[in-house]
From Swiss-Prot:
Residues 162-243 form the PPIase FKBP-type domain. InterPro entries: PPIase_dom_sf, PPIase_FKBP_dom, Trig_fac, Trigger_fac_C, Trigger_fac_C_sf, Trigger_fac_ribosome-bd_bac, Trigger_fac_ribosome-bd_sf, Trigger_fact/SurA_dom_sf. Residues 448-482 have a biased composition (Acidic residues). PANTHER family: TRIGGER FACTOR CHAPERONE AND PEPTIDYL-PROLYL CIS/TRANS ISOMERASE (PTHR30560), TRIGGER FACTOR-LIKE PROTEIN TIG, CHLOROPLASTIC (PTHR30560:SF3). Its EC number is 5.2.1.8. It catalyses: [protein]-peptidylproline (omega=180) = [protein]-peptidylproline (omega=0). This is Trigger factor. The keyword Cell cycle applies. Belongs to the FKBP-type PPIase family. Tig subfamily. Keywords: Cell cycle, Cell division, Chaperone, Cytoplasm, Isomerase, Rotamase. Transmembrane segments: none annotated. GO terms for biological process: 'de novo' cotranslational protein folding; cell division; chaperone-mediated protein folding; protein transport; protein unfolding.
Amino acid sequence: MKSTVEKLSPTRVRINVEVPFTELEPDFDRAFKELAKQVRLPGFRPGKAPRKLLEARVGREAMLDQVVGEAVPGRYTEAVTSSDVQPLGQPEIEITKKEYGEDLVFTAEVDVRPEITLPDLSALEITVDPIEITDEEVDTELQSLRARFGTLTGVDRPAKDGDFVSIDLSATVDGKDVPEATTEGLSHEVGSGQLIEGLDDAIVGLSEGESKEFTTTLAAGEHAGKEAVVTVTVKSIKERELPEPDDEFAQLASEFDTIDELKESLTEQVRRVKRVQQAEQIRDKALELLLEQTEVPLPEKIVQAQIDDTVHNAIHGLDHDEDRFAEQLAEQGSSREEFDANTRTEAEKAVKTQLLMDALADQLEVQVGQGDLTERLVLMSRQYGLEPQQLLQILQQNNQLPAMFADVRRGLTIAAVVHGATVKDTDGNDIDTTEFFGPSGGAQAEAEGADEADADSDADSDTEADSDADSDTEADEADEAK
């Protein structure tokens, strides 16, 4: 087999392939053997019919079409392997010569990774915000912890923000009841904004037993996007009483003996979260600088495929109704033209980023180890609430392991870039990036940073949930409503 590569553009090539007929003869032999097992000819046992009779029965051209159809994908792969091209996406194949006894000739046009001239990574200078912790931020953490140990007490006054109320809801659209919007005894934290728009404003000022109507746009269900008249009735009002922030509370809520020790711990907790946020800013700034300094030719078909995927996902939930989609965008203060423009911009940036990261990974000779993949798998399994082995099976079934591998490699690459750059905060202080990205730009610290962020997020969620559970059943229901 002979193959040549013709460069059509920086991101697209045409591969010309010639396959001698003699190389296809084994394919014909296999095809006829399979056909002989399926076709019964008088006077011959199954699988024993002569090839000429089989050709006469099904036609030589039909057999040629079958053999060529089965042979082309493998020959294309062989041609790609023997060349230096790195395909992106599926090829467009055209068979230009197909005759029995003659060479098979076909072309394959495909998008490829372009050649990219990379900037001097050692000259990269990254500047990010310094870590600053305010008393208000620590107080917010303390308030959250106090709420965890708070109690709900009934009050005889109008509802206000922060109260927990039990409410009945009903709604009508065009004068007709909406059954799915009717509920009784629903617990809700006033001011949380967790239910429907306008509800909190309607509840504030209502006393037990009072009702109020308000107009809102339904966000889900059969009447999603339609204006509805909602009636809310307050059944009960409770306020959360918080424990005093003193030494006794510190001993109750933590392993510390004094409130000052507890505040120091909360300060460190805030600092830990901000360190992770700073690391994310470093990563994002590094990528931003690289994109600004590097020209990356974009393969249009790959960009368009990403655009098509985004559009499909956006309107799939609307049964691909373009009119409803346009109405939804209008309600958000946007338009289809703005959506399309933003989608293209984001798609181009995403493709450019992937191509740039892959080129950098090649230049830096980034290797993905088994430990890197295992760390990512464990991290993802925590995020999805699955066992690592279960998630691995899902990724294998959906052929998503290559995508995970590529993502891990890109993470290792940006870590290596950051490690080699000069990183300072806006006050001019050097930032030790090894804490986040490892001494050699590895993924271990990156994964640990992500773990810290997840742990802090989980702790916040647990705090809210435990607060509701410890305080009152109604608060539990309010959490569910959120």
